[in-house]
């Protein structure tokens, strides 16, 4: 399974990169992707995730060829 992972805004600094290309043999969830790609870093409070540009929960199953994006909550005024 091939997955593209992107980290936006401060999360790129938090994990030390803005994107990764991953290869896995087993089925994974969005949460699994975070844990494996960040070497087990704690999941930030209010983390937002998207799969193929649609908001997704951390327990959503990821498919081959998907793009998973992580980003902090959007704020503004």
Please report, for each region that a protein language model flagged, where it lies by residue.
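Ubiquitin-like/PB1-type beta-grasp interaction modules and other compact soluble beta-rich domains
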Residues: 1-76
């Amino acid at each position: 399974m091939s997955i593209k992972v992107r980290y936006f805004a401060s999360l790129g600094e938090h994990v030390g990169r803005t994107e990764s290309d991953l290869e896995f043999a087993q089925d994974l969830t969005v949460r699994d992707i975070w844990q494996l790609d960040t070497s087990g870093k704690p999941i930030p409070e209010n983390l937002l995730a998207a799969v193929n540009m649609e908001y997704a929960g951390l327990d959503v199953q990821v498919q081959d060829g998907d793009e998973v994006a992580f980003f902090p909550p959007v704020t503004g005024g």
